[in-house]
Structures are given as structure tokens and as C-alpha cells.
Amino acid sequence: SIYVYIKRKNRVYSKNKIVVVEKEQLKNTEFVIVADDCWGAAVYQWYGRSYNSPFAGVGIYGDCFIKLLSDFDEYMKKELKFVTETKYPQRPLNYPMALLGDVELHFTHYKTKEDAGTKWERRTQRMLEVTDKDNYFFKMSDVWGASEENYEAFHKLPFKNKVSYIPKN
């Protein structure tokens, strides 16, 4: 119908106009998104920005994500070690997986460990150039099996910018 057509055109026009305004507002602002799933990559794409985070295209189970964030700076100094077995058997490993210390990182959007490792290193360096933690945004959802305890722990972390998406019962 013509109504649906107009509604779609308006949505595309509005989206493009909003993005232009938001891009202008963020022009000189570097920000880092640390998410437990691919959400951060979508935000960087929306704004046409380089990935300032190695977590783009990476999934992290709830317990591991809380462990990582609880000692974030120390974990980010660790080296990736690619492995072939996971402690979370819910999902078949048909993608590269690595340990960062004892935290599992699931590179679900990568074909090879070489590609995953190269992008991890490059994006980690880019992330570490953003030294003001007030420009870091942390996001958690239930996509990778976060529990209620994980959400509670997440919101007790000392980071300024946190958001979580919790499913309704």
C-alpha cells in the first residue's frame, strides 16, 4: 500500500538525517564499545567509524564477561591463545576461539584464527589509545547466556557507562 511505502521512505530519510547530525556531534570524539556480542560492531557501522574495540565480532559468555570486566586492564594486557575446546558446549565451535587468560572469546564472525588474531591485535591497540575510561561504553545482554547474577555483578562494576538488555520473564 502507499501508506507502507511512505512509512518506509520516511524511515530511511529520518535515519539518514539522524545519522548525519549524530556523526557531526561525535566528529572529534573517540569512543570504545566493550560488548559481550556483536552489538558494538553494529554501532560502529551505524556511525561509519573504525572499530575502536577488539570485541567487534566476538561473543563472550556471561561468566567470562564479568571476569574480564572485573579486571579489565589486566586482561587486556594478556596475549590471545587460540584453542579448540570450550567449557560451554551449548554451541558448536565452527569458528575460531581463544583464551585471554581464562576468559573465552568466541570469534563467531571470523573464518580463521589468523584473521581473528590480526584484527584483535590491531583493534586492541586502537582501543588502548583511548585512555579516558569515560569514553568506554560497556554492554551486556543474554545472547551469550548471562545469568541474573551476571547482570547484578555487571551493574556493580565501577564503569561510568553501562547498559544491559535483560529479557522479561
PLM regions: where:
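Conserved binding-pocket/active-site segment within a compact domain
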Residues: R126-N169
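Short amphipathic alpha-helical surface micro-motifs
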Residues: Y13-K17, T118-E121, W144-S147
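Low-complexity, compositionally biased segments
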Residues: S1-Y3, Y13, W39-G40, M76, ...
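Membrane-proximal basic amphipathic "stem/tether" segments
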Residues: S1-K27
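Positively charged, amphipathic N-terminal segments that serve as targeting/anchoring signals
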Residues: V19-T29, A35-M140
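Generic serine detector
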Residues: S1, S14, S50-S53, S70, ...
